[in-house]
Amino acid sequence: MSIVCSPRWKLIGVAGLFLFSPCVVAQKAKPAKFKVALSGRADFHTIQEAVDHAPATGAIIRIAPGTYHEKISIRSAHVILVGAGDRPADTIITWGDSAKNTGSTFKSGTITVFGAGFEAENLSIANTWWDDHPSQADRSQAVALQLEGDKAVLDRVRIVSGQDTLFANSGACHGDLSSPCAADRQFFHDCFVEGHVDYIFGEAKAVFDHCELHSRRHGNVMITAQSRHSPLEDSGFYMLHCSITGANDGSKVVLGRPWRDNATVYFYDTDVEQDIDPAGWSEWGDRLATSTYREYKSHGPGANLGNRIVKSPDLELGEEAKFSTARLLAGEDAWNPEREVKVLRTLAGSR
């Protein structure tokens, strides 16, 4: 509830008396609540139907355990998807498109989000193109989640594909490239992301906190491909306290390559369980010199910092404090995505 005051005085009646007041009480609208299940009692039997019925105030969509074969588009703001199972693998949203059969990487996503304030909890999102088309001739980009919008939060979400698994993007900085610009903010907490070529890519300002980045077998594996349209925008990928896993099967694994000039990626306090190529990073179109690639406090059997082609300067006294979600994503509105995670876990625990 909030108090809204008008510049004009308004005549109101209270207990039979008439008073003049400049203020009225406004009730904050609540999001709709829907239940989705494959069968039985539910508001809807597909997730897309529930999304399509979301009002402007948003919707909390609880999804019963099961495998939902759907390609989902979310354009409304404040849509929250919550898996109602005991673990993320109990509720799976899956599809199998690619750039090859749709004509574009950006049409291949299993879930595509353009609404601000999107949240997801305790579920799995998969693109099965690479599993369904194992031949080399069919290799193609196949997005599982395309996410574009400010203040997105994902907690305990599994995102699985091959090439271009997670498109963590921002549409905020495509206009005037001569002025500073704040990119869309996204927070991934306790998530699992699997893929091989550029499997986390895009232009968002995204923090990955305590996530597992799992590399699939492939000749060349690039974990990230970050992008900026301008050196004045603040986008970047920040991997905080994450782990890098995958079989040591001969794949050449690097932390990332620059999709465009001024790519920005930080790995901080990473448990490197998989062997990483000693170079650490790879070139793409002579953009490496413009990029900001940093790696601090990596540890584990695959952490070998001696021969990195991009050297990380020593942290100055007190500089480590910037590697926190609160510092990185607060913005001008003091956003606190960690508080949203607590709310999401409460929603997942309710029945």
Residue ranges and their predicted role:
Residues 13-22:
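Bacterial N-terminal signal peptides
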